[in-house]
């Protein structure tokens, strides 16, 4: 098998509408059309899809996913101005410039500006 890329990342959220407000309005993703699959939304994040799925219980899954940004300092400033707590970590050669935040449901997200 040779993967062609990542199609989407699925995230369980307790409230799909609140999730949409954060990922679309705060993080700037674009809402996509979605078939009738129950409560949830599909979003575009620069050509990669993020699927929000409303769930009363969050199953075990990935620890975090990373959002690539062109200017991490500008992204951090923008998020902080919107009241989001963002933790920037020291630069690690080979890993790029990184910062971490949590969505309203406690899911961990990484911002990554490649070297």
Regions found by a protein language model. Give the residues of each.
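Vicinal oxygen chelate
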Residues: 1-2, 32, 81-115
């Amino acid at each position: 098998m040779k993967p062609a890329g990542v199609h989407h990342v699925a995230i369980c959220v307790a409230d799909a509408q609140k999730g949409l407000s954060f990922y679309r309005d705060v993080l700037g993703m674009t809402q996509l059309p979605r078939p009738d699959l129950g409560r949830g939304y599909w979003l575009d994040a620069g050509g990669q899809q993020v699927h929000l799925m409303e769930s009363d219980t969050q199953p075990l899954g990935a620890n975090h996913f990373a959002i690539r940004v062109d200017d991490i300092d500008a992204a951090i400033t923008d998020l902080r101005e919107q009241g989001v707590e963002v933790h920037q970590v020291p630069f690690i050669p080979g890993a790029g410039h990184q910062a971490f935040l949590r969505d309203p449901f406690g899911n961990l997200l990484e911002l990554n500006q490649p070297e």
